[in-house]
Structure formats: structure tokens, C-alpha cells
């Protein structure tokens, strides 16, 4: 069956084609395209090379693409009661669905049937004519009574006695002697979950949960860590999303967001204890690292961000001072290279890669270079690290530590992953020239078990032995910031 006839409900092929292309054209779609989403399915219609293209929908037939684009552009995705996948399959299908069309208003798969659609046309016309002269409430009453009786009823006249057809259905259930009634806790949980799904069936509420998805994901990770759960507990995800939307604060500062997420988690703890008799450990201090930092948060809150990062992928020692050191060095790098608009994560990775290449020795015969060439958004930029070196020296002098080494040992896992991702294989060890270059940095001995199963264990063992037994200390001239 012709796709254009199918999607428009117009039986004349030429008229159906004209109707489709009155909507599916460059002018209507616009230069930026149009996006649509429903129940997790997302599509974007764009005009490309004199034809419509749909992100999220592919077909070898251009007429099928045009038909589905017409369906989207006419608002079909937002008005249909069917699952978007079913709509895709209907448009793709080549079989004749004429009989199916006759059950829909105007034969369109996105059209909604009116409550009086089963009445004869004359009765429907009478109801429509009566609605024009009746008040809204009387018009609604007229339609409801007419539908129930099965014919048009004039509610302004004396109603004659009639029999209203009612159908009583008896539901037969098979019950075993041991399952006559469910435990109260199970019944309560079923009612709770049913009510939740009814609340989430609202498209606006469901769409709003996307705006808090980052918080829902991190909160779920917190619960999985605290309890013997898996990330597939969909009901927990649904509750998280709904409560985060309902309780979202107007003030979105970091401290308020922490209190907001903790309020939701506290409610979930109560639900878990009520239905499953499980106590969830962890308080606001444990939760705080799982609350994402936003780009608009002030600098002084960056230490919380790095506490979160260290919470997930670091070794244990230095846990108290490393987030503070990271915050100070990252802030210095971002301030010194403000024109590059570095994010905190980018800045931290640049610092770790820099010291993995040039070492973390407190004193050196050869100065570390002041700049590192970094590809940012497709362009190679010179990133200045002179300020980072100076700040690290001051921290080291004040605390009596090697701040660079403490930091890099603490984030050694992240360094390893960054070197592997960016293909950095620089190896300054002549005696270990054979090892994997991505592991050839002087804090590789601090790689934890979280990453160890992804690296060459033999090379890693050689590096650990070399670092622990190496007596060739690097000494000599003072650092550039000591001049």
C-alpha cells in the first residue's frame, strides 16, 4: 500500500503525495530541523541534500522516511496512544491496512476517536448541532447520555423512559488454598507501584524526569553502593525520578542541591525499610560526593567535586588533603588559561598528564617546561603550567610534602586511563624501555585494583619493583619558581 496514502488517509495517490510534501519540505522543517520525543524514543527531522532525513529512524525507502517525517511533523508522536515503535512498524509495513484505517477517524494513525464515534452519523450530527445551543455542561451530558443509550437524546425535552444497557462482568480468578489473600505488605507495595506508574504516565512529568537524570543516576549509584542491589531496579529509578522532579528547589546552589537529593534518598530509605525490611546505611556525608557539580557553581565548591572523583577512583592515602590540593591547582590552571575555558575535569587531566610526562620530582637537573601542547576542541593550544608549578611549590613548602607527587599518586588510576585514552606512551626509563608506554610514569605503582585488571600485569610488576628499588635520585639546580 502506498506510504503516502497510509499516513494521510487520502485514497487518491496524487493528493496524498501533495499533502505529504506540503509539510515535508525545506521551508517547513527549517534550517535547524525539528525534534520530537515520547516514551524514550527520540527523533530529529532535518532537510539534507534535497530530501528529508530522520535521526533515530532509518529505511532504504525514501517514501517510508517521508511518511514517518509527515507523521512526526503533524504532531503524531505527541497525540498517539500507541508506542512509538508500533508507529514505526506501521509506517514500515507494506501490507494493506485499509480495514484498520476504517476504525480510525479520517484513517490517520495519530488521530484520536471521539466518544460518540460508534453512533450513526445522523446521531453524531444531532449531538454536534445540540452542542452549539447548549451550555458546556448540558452539551457534555447530552453526549454522555446519547452514547450510553446508543442514539441521540435531546436533553432539553422530557426524557422518555428507556433501558440503559449495562454490562456486568464477573472476573473469575483461580486461587490456590495457600494464596487466598496476599500479605498486606505485598498488597501495599502493589498499590504503591501502581500509583507511581499512574503518576509517571503523565507525559509532562515523564519529560521533566529527563532534566534531573544526572542526579537520578548518581543517586542510584549511591543506593547500589550502600545496598546489595543492581542498577536494574527500575522501580527505584522511577521513584527517584518522580521525587526529584516533585521536590526540585527553586534555589539551585550546591548546598541546597545536596539537601534536596538527601531528602529524596531519606524518603527512599523509608520506602525500602517499609516494604523490604532493609536499613540503608550512609548519611549526608556519604551522599555529598554523589551530588554533581554544575558549571555555574563557584570555585570554592570545587573541592567537593574532587572529593567525589576521589571517592570513585583513587587509592586511600592522602584522602584528606588531595581534594584540597587538586582544587587549588585546578583553580590556578583555569585562571591562568582563562581564554581556553577549561572545565575542572579537563584541567585536572592536563595536570596529571603533564606530571606523568615530566615527572613529580621536587628538584630536577632539567626544568619542567612551562607549557604543554593540548588539543582542545580540535585545535592545538599551548597550556601554561607555570602557575601550577608555583602553587604546588608553595603547598609543598607549607606542608612539608611533595604536593605534585601526593596528587598524582592519589589520582594514579585517572592518569593511567587518560594516558591510554589519549595514546600517551612517553617512557623516560631507559632500563624499562620494553614496558607498556601508557604505564611508564613515576606514580604507576599506585594504580589500584579498579584499573589493574585492564593493564599488563607483568609490566606493572616490573614498574613497581623499579620504583621501589631505584636509588638514582634526581638532584641538581633549583626549580624555576625557586629562582
UniProtKB/Swiss-Prot annotation:
One of its GO terms (cellular component) is host cell membrane. It is found in: Host membrane. The keyword Membrane applies. The keyword Transmembrane applies. Keywords: Host membrane, Membrane, Transmembrane, Transmembrane helix. It is a single-pass membrane protein. The chain crosses the membrane at residues 342-359. This is Protein P55. It comes from Grapevine leafroll-associated virus 3 (isolate United States/NY1).
Amino acid at each position: 500500500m502506498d506510504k503516502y496514502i497510509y499516513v494521510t488517509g487520502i485514497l487518491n495517490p496524487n493528493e496524498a503525495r501533495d499533502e505529504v510534501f506540503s509539510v515535508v519540505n525545506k521551508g517547513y522543517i527549517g534550517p535547524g530541523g525539528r525534534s520530537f520525543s515520547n516514551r524514550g524514543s527520540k527523533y530529529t527531522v532535518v532537510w539534507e541534500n534535497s530530501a528529508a532525513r530522520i535521526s533515530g529512524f532509518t529505511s532504504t525507502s525514501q517514501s517510508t522516511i517521508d511518511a514517518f517525517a509527515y507523521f512526526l511533523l503533524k504532531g503524531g508522536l505527541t497525540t498517539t496512544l500507541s508506542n512509538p515503535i508500533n508507529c514505526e512498524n506501521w509506517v514500515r509495513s507494506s501490507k494493506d491496512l485499509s480495514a484498520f484505517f476504517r476504525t480510525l477517524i479520517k484513517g490517520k494513525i495519530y488521530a484520536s476517536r471521539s466518544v460518540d464515534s460508534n453512533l450513526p452519523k445522523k446521531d453524531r450530527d444531532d449531538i454536534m448541532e445540540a452542542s452549539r445551543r447548549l451550555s458546556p455542561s448540558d452539551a457534555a451530558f447530552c453526549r454522555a447520555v446519547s452514547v450510553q443509550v446508543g442514539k441521540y437524546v435531546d436533553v432539553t425535552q422530557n426524557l422518555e423512559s428507556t433501558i440503559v444497557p449495562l454490562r456486568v462482568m464477573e472476573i473469575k480468578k483461580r486461587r490456590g488454598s495457600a494464596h487466598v489473600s496476599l500479605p498486606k505488605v505485598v498488597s501495599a507495595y502493589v498499590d504503591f507501584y501502581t500509583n507511581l506508574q499512574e503518576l509517571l504516565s503523565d507525559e509532562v512529568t515523564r519529560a521533566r524526569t529527563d532534566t534531573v537524570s544526572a542526579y537520578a543516576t548518581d543517586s542510584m549509584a549511591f543506593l547500589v553502593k550502600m545496598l546489595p542491589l543492581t542498577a536494574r531496579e527500575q522501580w527505584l529509578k522511577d521513584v527517584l525520578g518522580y521525587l526529584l522532579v516533585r521536590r526540585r528547589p527553586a534555589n539551585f546552589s550546591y548546598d541546597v542541591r545536596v539537601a534536596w537529593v538527601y531528602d529524596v534518598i531519606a524518603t527512599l530509605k523509608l520506602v525500602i525499610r517499609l516494604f523490604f525490611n532493609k536499613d540503608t546505611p550512609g548519611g549526608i556525608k556519604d551522599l555529598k560526593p554523589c551530588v554533581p557539580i554544575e558549571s555555574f557553581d563557584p570555585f570554592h565548591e570545587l573541592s567537593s567535586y574532587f572529593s567525589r572523583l576521589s571517592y570513585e577512583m583513587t587509592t586511600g592515602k592522602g584522602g584528606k588533603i588531595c581534594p584540597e590540593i587538586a582544587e587549588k591547582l585546578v583553580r590556578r590552571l583555569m585562571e591562568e588559561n582563562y581564554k581556553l575555558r577549561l572545565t575542572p575535569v579537563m584541567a585536572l587531566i592536563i595536570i596529571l598528564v603533564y606530571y606523568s610526562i615530566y615527572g613529580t620530582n621536587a628538584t630536577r637537573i632539567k626544568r619542567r617546561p612551562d607549557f604543554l601542547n593540548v588539543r582542545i576542541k580540535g585545535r592545538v593550544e599551548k597550556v601554561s603550567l607555570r602557575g601550577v608549578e608555583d602553587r604546588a611549590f608553595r603547598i609543598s613548602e607549607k606542608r612539608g610534602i611533595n604536593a605534585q607527587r601526593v596528587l598524582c599518586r592519589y589520582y594514579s588510576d585517572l592518569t593511567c586511563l587518560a594516558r591510554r585514552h589519549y595514546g600517551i606512551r612517553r617512557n623516560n626509563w631507559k632500563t624499562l624501555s620494553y614496558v607498556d608506554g601508557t604505564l611508564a610514569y613515576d606514580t604507576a605503582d599506585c594504580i589500584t585494583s579498579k584499573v589493574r585488571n585492564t593493564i599488563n600485569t607483568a609490566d606493572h610488576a616490573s614498574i613497581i619493583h623499579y620504583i621501589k628499588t631505584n636509588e638514582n635520585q634526581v638532584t641538581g639546580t633549583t626549580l624555576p619558581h625557586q629562582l
